[in-house]
Amino acid sequence: MNILITGGTGFIGRALVKSLLKEGHKVTVLSRTPDTVNKIIGNEVTTLSNLNQLTSEHHFQVIINLAGAPIFDHHWSDARKQIIRDRRIQLTEQLISYIKAATVKPELLISGSAIGYYGNQGNKVLIESSSPASHDFSQRLCADWEATAQLASQFGVRVCLIRTGLVLAHDGGLLQRMLLPFKFGLGGILGDGQQWMSWIHKADWIAIAKLMISNTAMQGVYNATAPHPVTNSEFTKTLAQHLRRPALLPMPAWLLKILLGERSELLLASQRVLPERLLTENFHFQYPELLSALTEPRTNHE
């Protein structure tokens, strides 16, 4: 297949690109820095620096939309929030415009989202049909991003939305950020530790995306989370045991709010999410339990 990917150099995107190339797909990556694409992935991919380089004659069977400015890396000033929104929603709007003009429409649009869509819901079990409980920045961002991507359906395109949990793998993402303080015995629970953390291993996320490509009956929203979410306290205990290190330095919620401001909601919000629709599809999770994800071979980066 001929596949266009935005966000192809990110933590998930670069592994997805490599996996699709191994299966013989032709991959085009949209990136503001095409040279970076070739350095990270190699010369097997075609690169674009701007969607304006596409014409109505370009034909992609699948578009996978993962692009977006990192949400956690910088203080959420009003200007930063606008950048985070624009790089997701404006780019998605541009993709919709391309799809509208395309002589041959893509068969499938897979577009990113996150479980932040649900807001802070305590112990409530959340499935794809669950309503959001709050309308904070993260929730509005996810809802607006999804609504924009859904516009592709009016042109006969099958749309799959991936509400992604906390993505784990040893070569990046949340786990890599947490490893260093835990290795030095400086890890600990965040807030009261009772907030639910719905996570997924990167290899399972990639398998979900590839299933969406092959299974033409799949459409709509899917929770990309492992079937066994854990509380922050359980996550901390399991990671500390895996590393054989103590976890003795809890981080109070008030201190997180001082240090991170509004971003602290990403660490303190509780989302107990289950992948109901994937389980209905009999999707096989390679890493259904947290310990299995933490102990995966370090060479397994795809």
Question: What is each PLM-predicted segment?
Answer:
Residues E93-H135:
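Conserved Rossmann-fold NAD(P)-dependent oxidoreductase catalytic core, especially the SDR/UDP-sugar
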Residues T36, N43-Q94:
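NAD(P)H-binding glycine-rich loop region in Rossmannoid oxidoreductase-like domains
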Residues N215-E262, T295, N300-E302:
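Mid/C-terminal beta-alpha module of Rossmann-like enzyme folds, strongest
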Residues A133-F137, G165-G172, D192-K202:
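Glycine-rich "substrate-gating" loop/helix at the edge of Rossmann-like oxidoreductase active sites
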Residues E265-E302:
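C-terminal amphipathic/interface module of NAD(P)-dependent oxidoreductases
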Residues I3-E23:
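N-terminal Rossmann NAD(P)H-binding glycine-rich loop of SDR-like oxidoreductase domains
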Residues S113, A147-H170:
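Conserved beta-loop-beta element that borders a ligand/cofactor-binding pocket
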Residues L179-G187, Q195-V230:
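Alpha-helical substrate-binding/gating segment
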